[in-house]
Amino acid sequence: MRISRLLIRVLLGFVILFITYILFPSIPKALVNTLNVYKLEERLNYYNDRLLDGNLKSKELENATFVTLARNADLYDLIETINIYENRFNSKHNYPWVFLNDEPFTRTFEVVMSRLTSGPTYFGVVNSSEWDIPKWIDMDIAHSNWNRLSREGVLYGGMKSYRQMCRYFSGFFWRHPLLDPYKYYWRVEPSTKLLCEVNKDPFRQLRLLNKTYGFVITLFEIGQTVPSLWNSTLEFIEKYPETLAKNNLWEWISDDNGKKFSHCHFWSNFEIADLDFFRSDSYRKYFDFLDKKGGFFYERWGDAPVHSIALSLFLDRNKLHYFDEIGYSHAPLLHCPRKGRCFCKPEEIDLSSNSSCIARFINLTNEDYDEL
């Protein structure tokens, strides 16, 4: 048995060397070295064990995909992230991965990402009309506001590309043709990490639990970035009252009966959700209404508060799910569960206090969470 295992490893090693140095000699040597550092032995062991166990039959998958919006310069940060997601979850399932960029990906980026992922990979370019600043924005006013926010020390306060990204994730990512075939998506950003082994399929959990949207981290939005977002939302509700769900989560996003925004939101750099919510008539109307207000560029409206307000108003509160068992990190924040094979220090949540957004969410939804 040991001889068979050794032989398989040697053969796989030669295959990897052939692919790297013969088929793709243009990949920088430093990049090849970086790839070799990331658990080559672990990957060989994984595929070796599957071969020996005869366990190569594909498992039934949900109609789902990973989604990453990235630039070519994010390649090295993504190498670590993709390896972690593959080793701690996707190598057991082989879900596809959709990569989007506002410009064409390089051949090196596509080759490396395709080698790292266990499922199919697809690479797309964002439609320029959905990425560029719309014509109704007064750029003199916008630049003046950007400079002010930058002077005030607001994170990304003066950054144009950040605003473009927030607007794209608020109203357009789900319209990309590469996402048309799918029902569920899992958003992954460069430099993020899974801190635990993910033993349950989150896509399947959403379907079986009849949930629409899943998250791991909640926090308060920076008030300076969304001064008019709530009033714009109230205008929308007055115009389209039929969009409100009966058992919505109004109290989570406003603790004074709608006078002010609580600033609580789901941190959207990690979200696992049903794309049909964003495809819905209610959400489309809401985004189009906000887009005409110009707050993505005159202020710094993020996709996180936009998603969160829409989810809290247009969905039954029982459609929202806290993936408390999934450990996740996006510096400087992380979520570390109490249970599971994790590589972090577990956190405590005081459910007796409404000072945190997650405590308020749990108290309002009355769900039982094993980790708490």
From Swiss-Prot:
It is a single-pass type II membrane protein. InterPro entries: Glyco_trans_15, Nucleotide-diphossugar_trans. GO terms for molecular function: alpha-1,2-mannosyltransferase activity. The keyword Endoplasmic reticulum applies. Probable mannosyltransferase involved in O-glycosylation of cell wall and secreted proteins. One of its GO terms (biological process) is cell wall mannoprotein biosynthetic process. GO terms for cellular component: endoplasmic reticulum membrane; Golgi apparatus; Golgi membrane. It is found in: Endoplasmic reticulum membrane. This is O-glycoside alpha-1,2-mannosyltransferase homolog 2. PANTHER family: ALPHA-1,2 MANNOSYLTRANSFERASE KTR1 (PTHR31121), O-GLYCOSIDE ALPHA-1,2-MANNOSYLTRANSFERASE HOMOLOG 2 (PTHR31121:SF13). Residues 28-372 are lumenal. Pfam families: Glyco_transf_15 (PF01793). Belongs to the glycosyltransferase 15 family. Keywords: Endoplasmic reticulum, Glycosyltransferase, Membrane, Signal-anchor, Transferase, Transmembrane, Transmembrane helix. The active site is at 271 (nucleophile). SUPFAM superfamilies: Nucleotide-diphospho-sugar transferases. The chain crosses the membrane at residues 7-27. Its EC number is 2.4.1.-. Residues 1-6 are cytoplasmic.
